[in-house]
C-alpha cells in the first residue's frame, strides 16, 4: 500500500505515476532554468526577481504594474517592492498612466536598457545551450507546443 492519500480522481497507478513524474520534471526544469538566470543576475549585482522584471520590461516595454506582476509571476506587493529597489538603483522608473490616476506604468531607464541588453542574451544563451545539448530542434519545437497546450496557450 502506498503512503499517500488517494485523491478523488480515480487514476490508475500508471497514470498517477506519469502525472507525478511530469510534475516533478517540470519543477526540476523550472529550478534549473531559474538558477541559470539567477547566476547571470547575481553576476550583475541583481536578485533573480529583479532580473525577471528587467527582462519583462525589456521585452514588452512600458507596462502597468498589474501586468508586470502577472508576467513575472510575482505577487503585486512583491512586484511593488522589487520595482522600488530597481527604481532606487536607477534601472526603472514609474509613471502615472495618462488614462487613469490609479494605473502606474513601469519602464526601463537608459541604464536599465543597458543591463537588459547585457544580461538577456547571456540568459537566453545559457538556457538554449542547456536545452540544445539534450534535445534536437524538433524535440524543442515539440516541447514548446506541448508546454503551450499544457498551460492553455495552444500552439506557440
Residue ranges and their predicted role:
Residues 1-44, 108:
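N-terminal leader segment of winged-helix/HTH proteins
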Residues 31-75:
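N-terminal helix-turn-helix DNA-binding core of bacterial DNA-binding proteins
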Residues 65-66, 77, 84, 104:
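Residues within helix-turn-helix
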Amino acid at each position: 500500500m502506498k503512503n499517500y492519500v488517494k485523491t478523488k480522481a480515480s487514476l490508475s497507478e500508471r497514470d498517477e505515476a506519469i502525472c507525478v513524474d511530469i510534475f516533478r520534471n517540470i519543477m526540476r526544469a523550472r529550478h534549473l532554468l531559474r538558477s541559470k538566470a539567477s547566476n547571470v543576475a547575481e553576476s550583475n549585482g541583481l536578485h533573480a526577481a529583479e532580473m525577471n522584471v528587467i527582462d519583462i520590461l525589456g521585452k514588452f516595454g512600458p507596462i502597468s504594474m498589474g501586468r508586470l506582476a502577472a508576467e513575472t509571476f510575482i505577487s503585486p506587493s512583491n512586484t511593488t517592492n522589487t520595482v522600488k529597489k530597481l527604481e532606487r538603483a536607477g534601472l526603472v522608473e514609474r509613471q502615472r498612466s495618462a488614462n487613469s490616476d490609479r494605473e502606474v506604468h513601469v519602464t526601463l531607464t537608459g541604464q536599465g536598457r543597458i543591463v537588459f541588453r547585457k544580461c538577456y542574451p547571456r540568459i537566453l544563451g545559457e538556457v538554449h545551450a542547456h536545452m540544445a545539448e539534450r534535445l534536437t530542434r524538433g524535440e524543442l519545437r515539440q516541447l514548446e507546443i506541448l508546454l503551450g497546450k499544457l498551460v492553455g496557450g495552444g500552439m506557440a
